[in-house]
């Protein structure tokens, strides 16, 4: 049987994804013809699920066409020419003037490419183009970029802070996917402290545990 848990960075778990209110907060805004928020900054400590939220938002906008109409999603590499990447993707997509265009960037920081993109994006917003931007980053990196001169829009943009995963949902997921009792599943959920990465990593290890190996044995080897 395939391991339902994954520790692959930036990959949305197919079988063990736990929905969060933060994800829905962003997606709910994008349902409307003219979303009230154009920019979201997803921030939190390492391992708290920032990238998973971004990946889920991008996935929903791309695939749920009945709910999100005329959306184009560009997932770009912040270490390369961001504007060049977006231009190439626009040409390939054959976009129309009514298409809403969302750029997703994981782990932003104050780099030359990011400042250049953000400055241009601010011009697009002022011109009234249907452009949207969702990014993730550590708090200090988000703050450093926010303090760049003339990036007022980014400084004032909606900030989404990651929160611990729901204890009950984690317990239920562990119980069903690992075929264990409620007490052990609850203990595992507590150990993760709600961190998305810890939830997946502990799930991976317990799925692969040997016969007779206990949770205590697994934790001693971490």
Predicted regions and their residues:
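A short, basic N-terminal segment
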Residues: 1-38
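Conserved C-terminal helix/linker of AAA+ ATPases
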Residues: 206-222
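Conserved catalytic segments around the Walker B and adjacent sensor/switch elements
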Residues: 39-41, 59-78
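C-terminal helical "lid" of AAA+/P-loop NTPase domains
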Residues: 186-191, 197-211
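Walker A/P-loop nucleotide-binding motif
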Residues: 36-56
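Active-site signature of alpha/beta-hydrolase-fold catalytic machinery across serine-
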Residues: 55-56, 60, 201
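Conserved small helical "lid"/interfacial subdomain of P-loop NTPases
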Residues: 157-185, 191
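Conserved Walker B catalytic segment
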Residues: 98-140, 147-150
